[in-house]
Amino acid sequence: MAETSKTVVVTQIGSPIGRRSDQRATLIGLGLNKMNRTRELEDTPAVRGMIDKIAHLVRVEDV
């Protein structure tokens, strides 16, 4: 049987304008570059770490 991997839905709710360059780069790394863009990502420790870095700029929903 194939295992279903957990996913998280991440939506950008904050603007990267005026933010540090590493926070902007993290948004781009998650595939978010414009307001209200949504991505469904695999729930891995690396992705969770990136989300923690920019928690004030994104909304996260577990799927």
Swiss-Prot record:
One GO cellular component term: cytosolic large ribosomal subunit
InterPro entries documented for this protein: Ribo_uL30_ferredoxin-like_sf, Ribosomal_uL30_bac-type, Ribosomal_uL30_ferredoxin-like
Signal peptide annotation: none
Swiss-Prot/TrEMBL keywords: Ribonucleoprotein, Ribosomal protein
GO MF term set: structural constituent of ribosome
SUPFAM superfamilies cross-referenced by the UniProt entry: Ribosomal protein L30p/L7e (SSF55129)
One BP annotation, GO: translation
Recorded superkingdom: Bacteria
Membership in a protein family: Belongs to the universal ribosomal protein uL30 family.
The protein's assembly and partners: Part of the 50S ribosomal subunit.
NCBIfam families linked to this entry: rpmD_bact
Name by which UniProt lists this protein: Large ribosomal subunit protein uL30
